Amino acid sequence: VSRISQYANTQNKVNDADFTANNPALIEIEKFSRFVLSPITPENNMQTNWFFERARGQYKTLRSKEGFTKSRLAAFDLKYPKKQMFTKVELAKYINAWQEVYNGKSLVIGPHIVVRGNEKNYARFMNYNLPEIKHIDVAYFEDAIAKAILFKAADKRYGTKVSGNQIGELKQVVVPYTLSLLNIITAGKLDLYKIWKNQHISMALSDFI
């Protein structure tokens, strides 16, 4: 029955990731994303949220529900900036690119999995790299956002005219391998909390990437 339900919808493309939305650990991450506020920084004097979209379309639905007047819509956009919305598939990319995981002697999580594509990477994330609900706390969420900031910074570094480093489709490979190498070079001791507190990476780290 479960397999039938996965392919019953012929009007919209349904991904396997859509059927994991009710995973307790993902629900817990969603809870933290709604109440953990980003720190005030010199660049932004307002605390905002990083919106974890556990189920497809959540952000758009909530924005429509709460933004029924222009002022409320503006308030929603300030609280939940679109650039700080991320899906569970994106979360899997951010975390798997940074952290290698072994299952026995087999390397089951790493950049080599990220580059295989979103669905394969997400499946590995769910099987090997999503913690039990008891291990998901504020620190886990803040670290996850720091990894998101790192990934976005590297992605921008290698993919815009401004950066001067446009490398086309190679970016999909270079970004995860760069971040994995960074973690190895720093022996896993890069200060992720500092990235969370600043809400961006330092110029020195950006130049290194």
What are these regions (language model features)?
Residues 200-204:
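Phosphorylation-prone, low-complexity intrinsically disordered regions
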Residues 2-195:
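C-terminal catalytic or substrate-handling cores of phosphate/nucleotide-
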